[in-house]
Regions:
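Conserved glycine-rich cofactor-binding loop
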Residues: 11-12
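Conserved glycine-rich Rossmann-like NAD(P)H-binding loop of the short-chain dehydrogenase/reductase
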Residues: 27-41
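The beta1-alpha1 cofactor-binding region of Rossmann-like NAD(H)/NADP(H)-dependent oxidoreductases
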Residues: 36, 57-68
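Conserved mid-core segment of classical short-chain dehydrogenase/reductases
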Residues: 90-105, 146
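Active-site helix of classical SDR
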Residues: 119, 153
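Residue(s) in the substrate-gating loop at a strand-loop-helix junction
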Residues: 137
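SDR active-site lid
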Residues: 166, 170-233
Length: 264
């Protein structure tokens, strides 16, 4: 019997890579994403490759839509073998430049609260041997100007994942958190396009191919001892530097590695 993978944010970027790779491994794939047009395109592309896939339009920050998505999956009498919590958003902007609290709330609700609510909602469909993968970020391991909300939510996901892992060990469900670096995805290209000018100073940010990073991440979702997955070499270096160097030196180096705004 085929296994089933449910992937939030699976219609494009890293999420679509996960869908495609797991489909090749004979998983039935269920995609949750906001945009019905993107979902249809993703499903058609997967089916062209012989992958069994379905899609559900769902904004994970909306509790009613999330409940409806759960009911739709449950009605198929399907157990979830791999739950991938990948949906997220980023707005590169100084905290002081936000003019509406609704925009702040949307990022918190999507990246952090929505991910937690999705995990809570679909936990009843997981069983012994199931896996959960949460997509955090290298920015979940440090703070960068222009990413106050993104860094806060991604850091929260790391601690959430660690706590959830310990809660589910007794049930034989493994939890992993990946912290990828910059990847060449539609979301990253839009992020760069909308970044304020001060963030575009210095050398262009180095990106990794999403398909390569996705395969690396999935290949490491094995065993109960593994938890934090760092597919990018620059993120691994950040972790090593943070452990080895005194905090003062670490901050000195990071302050000079990343752009900083000019005082107004």
């Amino acid at each position: 019997m085929k296994k089933t993978a449910l992937i939030t944010g699976g219609s494009s970027g890293l999420g679509f890579v996960f869908a495609e790779e797991l489909g090749k491994q004979e998983y039935n794939v269920i995609i949750l994403a906001r945009d019905p047009v993107k979902i249809d395109h993703a499903i058609a592309s997967l089916k062209e490759k012989g992958i069994t896939a379905t899609g559900i339009s769902c904004d994970i920050s909306n509790e009613n839509q999330l409940k409806n998505a759960f009911d739709a999956v449950k009605s198929q009498e399907t157990k979830i073998d791999f739950l991938i919590l990948n949906a997220g958003m980023v707005i590169p902007q100084l905290l002081s430049d936000y003019t509406e609290t609704s925009v702040i709330r949307k990022q918190l609700d999507t990246n952090l609260c929505g991910t937690i609510m999705t995990a809570w909602q679909f936990l009843p469909l997981l069983q012994k041997g199931s896996k959960i993968l949460i997509t955090s970020s290298g920015f979940g391991l440090m703070g960068a100007a222009g990413y106050t909300l993104y860094c806060a939510t991604k850091a929260g996901l790391i601690n959430f994942g660690e706590a959830l892992r310990r809660e589910l060990l007794c049930k034989g469900i493994n939890v992993y958190v990946s912290c990828p670096g910059d990847m060449d995805t539609p979301q990253f290209r839009e992020e760069i396009r909308t970044s304020p000018d001060w963030m575009k100073t210095g050398s262009p940010r180095k990106t990794q191919a999403a398909d390569q990073e996705g395969r690396k991440i999935l290949s490491q979702c094995k065993g109960k001892m593994k938890f934090l997955i760092l597919p990018a070499s620059d993120v691994k270096l950040l972790v090593i530097v943070s452990k080895v160097l005194p905090r003062k030196i670490r901050d000195y180096l990071l302050d000079r590695m990343f752009p900083q705004p000019i005082a107004k």
